C-alpha cells in the first residue's frame, strides 16, 4: 500500500473534498451548513481521496467548534484515524447519520467504519442523539396554558435555573461538564451556547406555575443553520407534571410566530421523557447524531 498524504485544503483545491463517495448522505444533511475551505482536510493515497473531514464553527468563530463531516473510503479506517489524529484542532466529532442506519446493512457498515476510525484516533463515544425537524405540515403542538412565560433580562436567573436543572440530568454533555467542573461549568456552558447563537437575547424565557413557582426555562434560538430549540429544562421539584411538553410547545409557537418555517431540535437516546415529548409535539426524527469526545492530550 502506498504512503498516505494528509492535505489541508483552501479555495483552490476545495473541490477535492467532494470526490469521495457519500453513502451516509452527509451532503443533504449539511445543505444549510457553511463549511470553510481552510477548515477541510483530506487524506490521499495514489492521488485519490480516501478520507475527509470538515471542521465547523459559527461565522465569527476563529477556531472550529466541532468536526461534523467525516468520511472514510472502504478499508481506509487507518487513513481516517490519521486525518483526525494529526489535525490542529482536537474538538468533538459529530457523525450525522440517516435515521435508519442500524436497519440498513450498507449504511451500518459505513457508519461503523467511521466509528472505528474515530476510536483509532483516540476519540471516545459520548452519546447518541435523535435529530428532529418540525415543519408546518405536522401541525403546531397544542399549548396547554398551564404556565406563565416571561422574558427575563438577568443572566443570573438563568444561571441559577440551569444549576438546578442540571443537578438531576440525563444529558450526556451536561454530565460530562459536571464531572469536569461541577454544576457551575455545566450552567456556564449552556449560557455560552445561548449567547453564541445569533438570535436575540430577549427571546430567552422563564416559565412559572399558577402558584408563582419557577417551573423551568425554554430557549428558542437561531443557530447558524436556522431556528431551533436551544434548550428545554424543568427544575427537579416541578418534574412529574409534564411541563417539558408545555415548554416545548411554547418554544415552537414562539419561533413560528417570528417567521420560522421549520424548527430543529435534538435529544439524547437515553433521555426517554424528552424523546416522548418531541413525539407528542409532532417532531419527527429525521436523522441521528453520534457524538465522540476528542482524544485527551497530555
Residue ranges and their predicted role:
Residues 1-29, 143-184:
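Short amphipathic alpha-helix that is part of the acyltransferase structural core
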Residues 18-45, 59, 176-209:
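Active-site rim helix/loop that mediates acceptor-substrate recognition in acyltransferases
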Residues 29-101, 210, 214-227, 235:
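Conserved donor-binding loop and adjoining core beta-sheet/short helix segment
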Residues 76-153, 292-294:
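Acyl-donor-binding surface of acyltransferase catalytic domains
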Residues 76-90, 234, 240-257, 275-280:
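Conserved acetyl-CoA-binding loop-helix of GNAT-fold acetyltransferases
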Amino acid at each position: 500500500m502506498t504512503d498516505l498524504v494528509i492535505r489541508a485544503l483552501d479555495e483552490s483545491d476545495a473541490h477535492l473534498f467532494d470526490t469521495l463517495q457519500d453513502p451516509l448522505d452527509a451532503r443533504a444533511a449539511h445543505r444549510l451548513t457553511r463549511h470553510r475551505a481552510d477548515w477541510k482536510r483530506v487524506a490521499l493515497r495514489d492521488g485519490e481521496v480516501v478520507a475527509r473531514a470538515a471542521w465547523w464553527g459559527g461565522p465569527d468563530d476563529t477556531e472550529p467548534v466541532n468536526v461534523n463531516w467525516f468520511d472514510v473510503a472502504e478499508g481506509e479506517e487507518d487513513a481516517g484515524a490519521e486525518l483526525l489524529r494529526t489535525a490542529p484542532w482536537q474538538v468533538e466529532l459529530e457523525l450525522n447519520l440517516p435515521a435508519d442506519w442500524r436497519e440498513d446493512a450498507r449504511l451500518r457498515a459505513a457508519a461503523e467504519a467511521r466509528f472505528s476510525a474515530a476510536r483509532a484516533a483516540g476519540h471516545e463515544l459520548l452519546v447518541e442523539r435523535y435529530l428532529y425537524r418540525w415543519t408546518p405540515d405536522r401541525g403546531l403542538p397544542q399549548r396547554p396554558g398551564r404556565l406563565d412565560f416571561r422574558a427575563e433580562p438577568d443572566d443570573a436567573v438563568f444561571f441559577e435555573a440551569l444549576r438546578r436543572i442540571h443537578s438531576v440530568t440525563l444529558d450526556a454533555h451536561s454530565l460530562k461538564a459536571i464531572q469536569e467542573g461541577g454544576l457551575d461549568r455545566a450552567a456556564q456552558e449552556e449560557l455560552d451556547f445561548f449567547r453564541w447563537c445569533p438570535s436575540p437575547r430577549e427571546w430567552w424565557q422563564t416559565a412559572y406555575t399558577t402558584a408563582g413557582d419557577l417551573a423551568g426555562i425554554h430557549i428558542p434560538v437561531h443557530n447558524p443553520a436556522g431556528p431551533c430549540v436551544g434548550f428545554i429544562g424543568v427544575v427537579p421539584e416541578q418534574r412529574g407534571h409534564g411541563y417539558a411538553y408545555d415548554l416545548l410547545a411554547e418554544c415552537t409557537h414562539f419561533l413560528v410566530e417570528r417567521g420560522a418555517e421549520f424548527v430543529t431540535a435534538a435529544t439524547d437516546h437515553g433521555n426517554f421523557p424528552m424523546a416522548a415529548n418531541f413525539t407528542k409535539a409532532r417532531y419527527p426524527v429525521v436523522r441521528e447524531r453520534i457524538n465522540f469526545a476528542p482524544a485527551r492530550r497530555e
